[in-house]
From Swiss-Prot:
Homodimer. This is tRNA (guanine-N(1)-)-methyltransferase. It comes from Shigella flexneri serotype 5b (strain 8401). GO terms for molecular function: tRNA (guanine(37)-N1)-methyltransferase activity. It catalyses: guanosine(37) in tRNA + S-adenosyl-L-methionine = N(1)-methylguanosine(37) in tRNA + S-adenosyl-L-homocysteine + H(+). Its EC number is 2.1.1.228. Keywords: Cytoplasm, Methyltransferase, S-adenosyl-L-methionine, Transferase, tRNA processing.
């Protein structure tokens, strides 16, 4: 996968290119990241990249000409088929389904805004899609872009150590992940669930699915509203609810 970055602070993306899963992907040639700074496309000695908004008001906007020239340079480098994305609070909210959708693109260009944003006409003429990582404001689009790159790169074949890892992540099936345990078997009196030590893969799968359903019901119940549960999933969720109620009753009785 090839990703182009339009940013006033391209050095921030070393966190992606030099470390962790994405760093290994870059090193192994599975992910290629190039960056363009609008500042390199300015024509004044101050390398100005911001301008006042029409109508007044606080703050500045990114200057149109350097930004457009940077986007055009990235498009030229990408060739045909690159999707241009603007990271924006007004965009579609990124979720696992969206990540999976974006991962089908072999070429992405991510435009990172700064100041109060970018000219609406640049969005209309240069941007294919707007994406947001949440209903809050950040100082720029770099962190959302890094979030998008990290999440999308997990779908690139060969990036993860285990091919099933991406499909077993939280939200991959619309559910939160189940609890995980490693050594020691007992930690401050808390034991690993016996089923995970049993070696019975069918029971382990069943336990993990039940816990995933139950955790989603407890913490993010609205996610379940969007799912059509299978007969097995509905049965396991009902079991979890019964067990949870029994545990709560037992806890209340001890209080």
């Amino acid at each position: 996968m090839w990703i182009g970055i339009i940013s006033l602070f391209p050095e921030m993306f070393r966190a992606i290119t030099d470390y962790g899963v994405t760093g290994r992907a870059v090193k192994n040639g599975l992910l290629s990241i190039q960056s363009w700074s609008p500042r390199d496309f300015t024509h004044d000695r101050h390398r100005t990249v911001d301008d006042r908004p029409y109508g007044g008001g606080p703050g500045m906007l990114m200057m149109v000409q350097p930004l457009r020239d940077a986007i055009h340079a990235a498009k030229a480098a990408a060739g045909e088929g690159a999707k241009v994305i603007y990271l924006s609070p007004q965009g579609r909210k990124l979720d696992q389904a969206g990540v999976s959708e974006l991962a089908t693109n072999q070429k992405l260009i991510l435009v990172c805004g700064r100041y109060e944003g970018i000219d609406e006409r640049v969005i209309q003429t240069e941007i294919d899609e707007e994406w947001s990582i949440g209903d809050y404001v950040l100082s720029g689009g770099e962190l959302p872009a890094m979030t998008l790159i990290d999440s999308v790169s997990r779908f690139i074949p060969g990036v993860l150590g285990h091919e099933a890892s991406a499909t077993e992540d939280s939200f991959a099936e619309g559910l939160l992940d189940c609890p995980h345990y490693t050594r020691p078997e007992v930690l401050e009196g808390m034991e690993v669930p016996p089923v995970l030590l049993s070696g019975n893969h069918a029971e382990i799968r069943r336990w993990r699915l039940k816990q995933s359903l139950g955790r989603t019901w407890l913490r993010r119940p609205k996610l379940l509203e969007n799912l059509a549960l299978t007969e097995e999933q509905a049965r396991l969720l009902a079991e979890f609810k019964t067990e949870h109620a029994q545990q709560q009753h037992k806890h209340d009785g001890m209080a």
